[in-house]
UniProtKB/Swiss-Prot annotation:
One or more lysine residues are methylated. Keywords: Methylation, Ribonucleoprotein, Ribosomal protein, RNA-binding, rRNA-binding. This is Large ribosomal subunit protein uL11. PROSITE patterns: RIBOSOMAL_L11.
Amino acid sequence: MAAKKVVKQIKLQVEAGKANPAPPVGPALGQAGLNIMEFCKQFNERSKAQIGLKLPVVITVFSDRSFTFITKSPPAALLVKKAIGLETGSATPHTHKVGKITRKQLEEIAKTKMEDLNANDIDAAVNIIAGTCRSMGVTVEA
């Protein structure tokens, strides 16, 4: 049997456990001709352990209208905001600082994100997350 032909890849950010046919999920999957409810059921089942977080998901659509999807770890900015209790980052990050984060907190976030980051070890991953913090107006403590 020949491999299925990939027609399209759809990238979305959906709140864990709360996928429903309303936008943004419905229109994106409807255009590809997928069964929206089937995706919602599978996604909600897979992501129920991470409720409350927005998860990036990559949906691969095949020529026979079947699909597979991969859920990734939450965005680093979301994890940073959650770790230090922020609502939003700074509008002017270099002049107005909105919070502080410790190296230990950075390491926890880096461990969570490690599989999705382009880093070889935990120190490189921590540096990537620290860069995200700086661009949000969060001071990184040594």
